[in-house]
Amino acid sequence: SELKGKVKLIDFWASWCAPCRAENSNLLRIYENYKDKGLVIVSISMDTHKKAWEEAIQEDKLPWLQLSDLKGIGKGIARQYNIQSIPQTYILDAENKVIAVGLRGKELEETIDKAIR
C-alpha cells in the first residue's frame, strides 16, 4: 500500500558494477528531491554475496528499499525481468504502467519530474 498511487523507480544494480555505483549519487539526489512528492525507489541487486551487497548499501548511504535474491544476473529475479545488463531502470507511473526504461542522469530526473506533476 506504500506504493499505491506513487511514481516508482525500480533500479537494478550490483555492488561490483562501477557505473551502478556512480549512478547512486544521482539516485540519492533524486530521492531527496522527490521522496515527499510521491516518488518511491526500490533497488534490486544482482549481487551474489550478501556482505558485499550490504557494504555497498552502507557505503553509498542508500536509504530506500533494497532487495536481492542473491542469485546474480541470468537467474531468479534478473531472469524474470529480463535484465541483461546493469545499471537498468524502470519508471512506473501512479497506475503502475511502465513509462520509461534505461534512463540515467538528467534524463531520469526529468522523466520522474514530469510523471510526478
Give a label for each model feature:
Residues K6-K8, P87:
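Alpha/beta-hydrolase fold active-site loops
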Residues N33-K37:
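Short helix-capping segments at alpha-helix termini
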Residues D11, V42-S45, L67:
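Short beta-strand segments
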Residues E54-Y90, A94-E95:
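Short, internal strand/loop/helix patches
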Residues W16, E23, M46, E55-I57:
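Long, His/Glu/Asp-enriched segments that create or flank divalent metal/ion-associated functional microenvironments
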Residues K4, F12-R29:
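Conserved redox-active cysteine motifs that mediate thiol-disulfide chemistry
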Residues I91-R117:
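Thiol-/selenol-based redox modules, centered on thioredoxin-like
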